[in-house]
Amino acid sequence: MELKDYYAIMGVKPTDDLKTIKTAYRRLARKYHPDVSKEPDAEARFKEVAEAWEVLSDEQRRAEYDQMWQHRNDPQFSRQFQHGDGQSFNAEDFDDIFSSIFGQHARQSRQRPATRGHDIEIEVAVFLEETLTEHKRTISYNLPVYNAFGMIEQEIPKTLNVKIPAGVGNGQRIRLKGQGTPGENGGPNGDLWLVIHIAPHPLFDIVGQDLEIVVPVSPWEAALGAKVTVPTLKESILLTIPPGSQAGQRLRVKGKGLVSKKQTGDLYAVLKIVMPPKPDENTAALWQQLADAQSSFEPRKDWGKA
């Protein structure tokens, strides 16, 4: 299996902290998201960045990955390696650690009559927009071939055309019967499990079946009310901002969230009041007039009150 340089993919150093890596991830996710990027390889780069983040954002996975990367060129790596506690590390453990990072289960086989083949688990990145309808996907994975000692002797590339149903959720598992490793002595094949990973979106956050989007509005739009154009997963809509709206206020748009077999979620627009740039003399005078007209308004009067 190829061990990718996740730090290089993220443009960070192995010594960088999680905050730095998270910042790099958010920047790259926005840069390469297919809805935003015009680069021809944007989707592939986006999935690569998401894969790197999946490992580096988890403290245990990152530690295991760092250990593997350090010894990647060691010819004895797959046979004799040392855990941090000094215990022996052999090829059986290698599969366990590698699967903990890449989400694959390559368990050591045992010689038994009519033994069932191993299951294989792979992660499939799905964009939010793709969850609305059933779509076809071509997936590629490696089919392990085990020797008589239950160790992986080689891996055979395999490609399948699969259907991803509408309404899939993050972490959902889809079973493809018989697409795992072959059974032994007439035993049934293992299964292939597709684990759905909903890719981060530059605009929407997922909250259960609902979606949240931050909607920037001007102070006068919040004060006077307005109608603003807001994107949804399907199309743009005209959202009514009520007069006197506050920063952080949530406006519900029914039926514009995620779709599943049981229900359709809602979209919540979270208002963010954005101030204009530093005012010139004329604009400052207008703000002062407003301040004078609202001199009795005290925004901090309820501080410290239950």
Curated annotation (Swiss-Prot):
GO cellular component: cytoplasm; nucleoid
Gene3D superfamilies: DnaJ domain, Single helix bin, Urease metallochaperone UreE, N-terminal domain
Keyword set, alphabetical order: Chaperone, Cytoplasm, DNA-binding
SUPFAM superfamilies documented for this protein: Chaperone J-domain (SSF46565), HSP40/DnaJ peptide-binding domain (SSF49493)
Gene Ontology annotations of biological process type: chaperone cofactor-dependent protein refolding; protein refolding
Annotated PROSITE patterns: DNAJ_1, DNAJ_2
Subcellular location: Cytoplasm, Nucleoid
Xref: SMART domains: DnaJ
Main location: cytoplasm
UniProt KW DNA-binding keyword: yes
GO molecular function: bent DNA binding; unfolded protein binding
Superkingdom of source: Bacteria
InterPro entries assigned to the protein according to its UniProt record, in alphabetical order: DNA-bd_curved-DNA, DnaJ_C, DnaJ_domain, DnaJ_domain_CS, HSP40/DnaJ_pept-bd, J_dom_sf
CDD domains the UniProt entry points to: DnaJ, DnaJ_C
UniProt keyword annotation of Lipoprotein present: no
Domain J: 5-69
PANTHER family xrefs: DNAJ HOMOLOG 1, MITOCHONDRIAL-RELATED (PTHR43096:SF52)
Reported function: DNA-binding protein that preferentially recognizes a curved DNA sequence. It is probably a functional analog of DnaJ; displays overlapping activities with DnaJ, but functions under different conditions, probably acting as a molecular chaperone in an adaptive response to environmental stresses other than heat shock. Lacks autonomous chaperone activity; binds native substrates and targets them for recognition by DnaK. Its activity is inhibited by the binding of CbpM.
Name of the featured protein: Curved DNA-binding protein
Species for this entry: Escherichia coli O7:K1 (strain IAI39 / ExPEC)
Name of the gene this protein is made from: cbpA
